[in-house]
Amino acid sequence: MEIQNTKPTQTLYTDISTKQTQSSSETQKSQNYQQIAAHIPLNVGKNPVLTTTLNDDQLLKLSEQVQHDSEIIARLTDKKMKDLSEMSHTLTPENTLDISSLSSNAVSLIISVAVLLSALRTAETKLGSQLSLIAFDATKSAAENIVRQGLAALSSSITGAVTQVGITGIGAKKTHSGISDQKGALRKNLATAQSLEKELAGSKLGLNKQIDTNITSPQTNSSTKFLGKNKLAPDNISLSTEHKTSLSSPDISLQDKIDTQRRTYELNTLSAQQKQNIGRATMETSAVAGNISTSGGRYASALEEEEQLISQASSKQAEEASQVSKEASQATNQLIQKLLNIIDSINQSKNSAASQIAGNIRA
């Protein structure tokens, strides 16, 4: 029996040693993935629930580490695929693999590589599932941040509106009070002062008429016939009782009352104007107070928006890392299939060789 071989035996052993070294490197990467997965506790069941309490920094760091390791595994997988592709070219029907020089250790090495890749595929699948849960948790956190952002904006708007309306109402009430006081001063103090002024003017006019009448009237009293040229002297004119009462109660007291009412009117007017100014100033500051009360809500909304962006970034990185892990798992699966094909080819070659040997012995 002649079994063709395109590579020398020494070269085949060299390739097996190289693949063993690469398998050790892949074993180390698989251990790294298992260490990463150990930091993400999960409750495995029909509906797995993420129980991790990683903060944003830890999540970003974990995602970056997973992405870095996934890139390394992807490069190693591509290299392994190329090596196996080159090896598969030697397993065509025209160029059958020669197993006559292979020892049991070489076959065991190929089987160990297949087992190692199977474990790596399992770890990558588990890591991809865990990263998917992390991405879901980050997306859920982003949705909660959106809800809290809306509530903060709504509460700040309500607070600002209530504050502005309340302060405006206080200012309007103060202005209305000032206007009412000014109207009261006009109705009471100014009207009283004007009435007293009319009374004073009437009193003076009546007194002047009475004096003029007494001075110009002829004297018929017999006691004045003998006065001669002094009969019209002021000292000889007798005043009536009304005139004496007017003179005994001078108009100074009435003028004082008028002055008092005038001063009271002016004071009340100034007080009313002050209230109006305070009311207008209060209403003008209501907008500022409303903006200040609303700014707190806007600040809280901005914080929630920042948390939302962080959660979205974390979710995106976790999804990308999960996708890379799934792709690496698929590549590993393809590599395992090729190794299994190699093992199957070896078994077929061994069986064929055994059959030919048995036939030769019988012959």
From Swiss-Prot:
Keyword Transmembrane helix: yes
Cell compartment(s), UniProt: Secreted; Host membrane
Keyword terms of this UniProt record: Host membrane, Membrane, Plasmid, Secreted, Transmembrane, Transmembrane helix, Virulence
InterPro entries given in the database record: BipC/SctB
Skewed-composition ranges (Polar residues): 1-16
Effect on the protein of changing residue 362 to K: Increases invasion activity
Regulation: Interaction with the membrane is affected by the pH.
Similarity comment: Belongs to the SctB/SipC family.
Protein name according to UniProt: Type 3 secretion system translocon protein SctB
Organism of provenance: Shigella flexneri
Gene: sctB
